[in-house]
Amino acid sequence: MPPRNMHLFQRRENRIPMEIPVILDGHRLLPGAEATFTENVSAKGARVVSVRRWEKDAPMILASRTGEFRSEARVAYCQTLRGDGYAVGVEFLATSGRWVVES
């Protein structure tokens, strides 16, 4: 039996550690935009830090604070961080503009 925390899948793309200022919007219970940053990025998604707990598969909008990129997205996971906040895995669905990593 595999350990509880072992992922049973392998990522298709590499994650690059990079702090990018972003805005999250679309939380079902807490309306309003949240200014935050990424921890790592790929061409198809990002891991962001949020003060809000997001539900898996919830829709959201992620946009760069510069306005150069915007994506309808899906929450892939939400993990509690030590201290305050959450690490949220975001999968890009419908994008416009230029992201920091291209496929």
Locate each region found by the language model:
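N-terminal helix initiation/capping motif
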Residues: M1-V41, V51, T95-S103
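Short, well-ordered loop/turn sites that connect or cap secondary structure elements
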Residues: R53-E55
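Hydrophobic residues positioned within well-ordered beta-strands of beta-sheet architectures
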Residues: I20, S71-A73, V88
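Short beta-strand-centered aromatic/proline hotspots
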Residues: E34-T36, S71-C78
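Short beta-alpha junctions and helix-cap segments that line functional grooves
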Residues: L8, A58-M60, R74-Y77
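Short conserved beta-strand and strand-loop elements enriched in small hydrophobics
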Residues: I20-H27, D57-F69
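Short, solvent-exposed secondary-structure boundary/capping segments
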Residues: A46-S50, L81-L93
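Short, conserved beta-turn/loop elements at beta-strand boundaries and strand-helix junctions
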Residues: H27, A43, C78-G83
